[in-house]
Amino acid sequence: MAHKKAGGSSRNGRDSESKRLGVKRFGGQVVLAGNILVRQRGTQFHPGDNVGIGKDHTLFAKTDGTVKFEIKGAARRKVVRIEPLAA
């Protein structure tokens, strides 16, 4: 009788789904309250004026306005703030 040996098992073939992190609204863009500005792990970007931070460190707009990115302080922190639209 003809026989075929069992094939070996592979130990590869796994990969995690991408998390789609990064800046979602860029400097100078007009945003509405609630818009997500940055998705991140940890605080690469810190919240400034009119910006909130979620429990997963997501930054979001608290008011309608224009997005501004700045570097502040001796620690050279990247800060995102919203400049409210002139009424």
UniProtKB/Swiss-Prot annotation:
Signal peptide feature range: none
One term of GO molecular function: structural constituent of ribosome
Keyword Transferase: no
Source domain of life: Bacteria
One CC-aspect GO term: cytosolic large ribosomal subunit
InterPro entries linked: Ribosomal_bL27, Ribosomal_bL27_CS
Ribosomal protein keyword on record: yes
GO biological process: translation
The entry's keywords: Ribonucleoprotein, Ribosomal protein
Region annotation (Disordered) ranges: 1-20
Annotated family: Belongs to the bacterial ribosomal protein bL27 family.
NCBIfam families (alphabetical): L27
Protein name: Large ribosomal subunit protein bL27
Organism: Thiobacillus denitrificans (strain ATCC 25259 / T1)
